[in-house]
Amino acid sequence: EPLGSSFAVLHSDEKEVGVALIDIGGGTTDIAVFEDNTIRHTAVVAVAGNKVTDDIRKGLGVMRDQAEALKCEFGAAMAEMAPDEEIAIPGVAGRTEKRVGRSTLAQIIQPRIEEILEIAAIEIKRSGFSRHLSAGVVLTGGGSLVKGTAELAAEILGMDARIGRPMGLTAGLVQEVSDPKFATGVGLVLYGLRPEMIGSTPFRTDHLDASDP
């Protein structure tokens, strides 16, 4: 997955001068370190966005789909970024709604995202290239969409961090697939469209002559 995402969200100059890609998916967080246009290190960690959702579900006593919606719509990776507002959560089976402060939600989310980023920091250091990442870190995947994730990453990793959105598409459903959660899929499409890949498809097209029945 890091290879697929890299084609969609990384600039070629970033891969040349050194960059770490952190793809926070649902079930895993994929890490890849690039330098001199070469993948120097990869790792897959079984702590990702679903763990954040589970923390919210257990912490607030809500259903899983409610927890996912709360994470995506109101979540923050840093408690100080959460506005002083309350969220009304519909009660289960007709019960009275719950009201939860956004700062409370952020306090549930932050420790898990910190854990993900701290593990990523260990893997980046393990690569031996942590001092050579002039382009810093690029975060992608659905888990990176939680507000403040890039800022928290910069703080924990001690380097520049940005959210990577799929690029390289010039027509069609560009807006629809520019979300980081589509990075891997878009990257694989772009990889397949590279000039050196055209013509390598195993499928055959037979041209029918006009005289053929």
State where each predicted segment sits:
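Helical "lid/coupling" subdomains associated with nucleotide-phosphate turnover
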Residues: 2-21, 32-213
